[in-house]
Amino acid sequence: MAIELEKKWVLKEIPDLTNHNFEFIKAEKIVQSYLSKDERLRIISKPGAKIKEYFHQIKNKIGEGQSIEESKTITEKEYLKLHKSAYKELTKVRRTYLNVADGFTYEIDHLRFVSPRVDILLMEIEFQDKYQDLLEVDTYFELPEFFDKYILADVTSYPEFSNYQLAQPIK
C-alpha cells in the first residue's frame, strides 16, 4: 500500500521532449474497468508483446491530489470473473518518461473516445517521495518552462478529470 501524491494537467498536444533531458521509459496500453468508484481492474499490455498483466486495485482519496493505492497482480481467470461486475471502462495509451534534471516520472496518457469523438491528453507527475502535500509541491516544484506551450490547464483539483469520471459505461 502506497500513498500517491500527484498533479494532473490537460495538454494541447504531446510535448516534443527531444533536447529537454527526458528519457523514454515505456509505452503501454491500459484498460481500466471500474467495479466501484474506488475499485478497479487493469489490463496492461506493451506494444508488440503478447503477455498482458492483470491487476486488481483499490484507490482511496485522502486529500487533494493524494490517495492510498493498493494493487495486487491477479490471473486472467480472476480478472474475467471480477470483470463481470464492472460497469465503466477507460482505455488509454500511456507514455512514461523520466526527467533526468528533476528525477520525476512524467506520464502522458492519451484517451480516445468514440462517441462523442474526442481525444484527451493528460499528464501526471507523482511526487510522494519528495513532497508531503500539494501545497509543498506548488511551493517548491517548477514544471520545466517549455511545457507552458503545451498545457491547457492544471486539473488536479477537478474531479471531472479523474479517470473514474472520464470512464464510459460498459455497453
Predicted feature residues:
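Phosphate-end processing signature that detects enzymes handling 5′-triphosphorylated RNA
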Residues: M1-K171
